[in-house]
Regions:
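Acidic, His/Gly-enriched loop-helix segments that form or flank divalent-metal centers
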Residues: 4-133, 138-143
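Short acidic-glycine loop/turn motifs at beta-strand connectors
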Residues: 43, 149-152
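C-terminal regions of proteins
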Residues: 145-147
Length: 152
């Protein structure tokens, strides 16, 4: 979405609500994303764009909604833009959520203290944490694409 909105990666991470609003006004969001499934679930994994519906709290944490599978369109539209690495504590106990949307260098930098988000030492490889595998390599910036082989 960076290339569609004109935001640079640093400003998108600082002004993420403005970035999300700008992204929602692109043909990608209006046409392609609207045609996508909200999630795909296997025995061990849930695949989704941003995250599962959760309640964002003022302290930037998220509260789990046990009925997320029955969430309405608005809840899914909101969850699509969540940063899964910040919301990872709101995962089902026996599932790992595989998500994109937010650059993996954020998780490596914030939670592993490994490199910076966008510096020369930024790590755009998949981010693995409790209940989450994040795969967004921020391709427009990093020139990389992350791929996983899942055997489930």
């Amino acid at each position: 979405a960076l290339q569609l909105t004109g935001f640079d990666p640093v400003m998108a991470s600082i002004r993420h609500y403005d970035f999300a609003d700008a992204a929602k006004d692109t043909p990608f969001y209006k046409e392609i994303i609207q045609a996508m499934l909200d999630y795909f679930e296997t025995e061990h994994y849930v695949f989704t764009h941003g995250w599962i519906p959760s309640i964002p709290n003022r302290d930037k944490s998220y509260s789990y909604i046990s009925s997320w599978r029955e969430a309405d369109r608005e809840q899914w539209n909101q969850a699509r833009w969540f940063n899964g690495m910040d919301a990872a504590q709101t995962a089902d106990e026996n599932k790992t959520i595989v998500c994109g949307h937010w650059h993996t260098s954020y998780g490596h930098s914030k939670y592993e203290h490994k490199g910076t988000e966008f510096g020369e030492d930024a790590d755009f490889s998949p981010y693995y944490g409790p209940g989450i595998i994040a795969i967004d390599a921020c391709t427009a910036f990093s020139g990389k694409v992350n791929c996983l082989v899942m055997e489930d």
